């Protein structure tokens, strides 16, 4: 706070926003999380001309150096930090390409990546409405079942997701014969349509 413009914007000095004071506010803010994200989305669109047509979805985790037993959302699970000896929570986050967050969820530390997308997708639609958005994510996050649901939704939900290497090898010969298409400076791709799927190489 004291290293930002917030004091000038609020007309207050840094004493109103000391670290512990802000921490105590978190529980109150949590009750209004969806309303706050909806408000912030509108402000970002107005102030920065931010577009929410492309959403980047990813997962991370944070661990606790505390003694078991684990409780609540603090569970043992796959540790991205190589700390399998610590309990953790999994955090799902969706942001715009500009880096503006549209939502997050804190989940149990033993939550599997491929079980998170369906619920988060519904939550974003319930808060921000249905729209023809493009979701970009790692290939380990969605299941084929969820991708099929996204394609068949009444308002189509598009996605860009990494293709498993085993499947990509099946299209290697067909992709080799495709011409390169330049999408912008120093970026060229090959496109291959297969039914409802468009592969980008």
Question: Could you say what each language-model-derived stretch is?
Answer:
Residues 1-201:
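Anion-binding and metal-coordination hotspots
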């Amino acid at each position: 706070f004291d290293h930002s413009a917030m004091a000038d914007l609020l007309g207050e000095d840094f004493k109103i926003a000391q670290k512990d004071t802000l921490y105590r506010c978190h529980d109150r803010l949590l009750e209004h999380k969806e309303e706050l994200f909806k408000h912030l989305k509108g402000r970002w669109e107005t102030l920065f001309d931010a577009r929410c047509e492309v959403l980047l979805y990813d997962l991370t985790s944070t661990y606790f150096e505390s003694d078991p037993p684990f409780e609540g959302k603090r569970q043992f699970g796959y540790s991205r930090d190589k700390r399998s000896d610590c309990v953790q929570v999994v955090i799902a986050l969706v942001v715009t390409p500009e880096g503006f967050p549209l939502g997050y969820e804190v989940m149990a530390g033993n939550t599997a990546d491929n079980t998170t997308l369906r619920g988060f997708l519904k939550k974003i639609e319930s808060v921000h409405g249905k729209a023809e958005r493009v979701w970009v994510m790692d290939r380990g996050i969605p299941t084929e079942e969820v991708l099929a649901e996204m394609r068949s939704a009444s308002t189509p939900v598009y996605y860009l997701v990494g293709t498993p290497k085993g499947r990509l090898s099946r299209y290697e010969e067909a992709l080799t014969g495709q011409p390169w298409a330049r999408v912008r400076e120093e970026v060229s791709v090959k496109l291959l349509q297969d039914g409802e799927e468009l592969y980008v190489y």
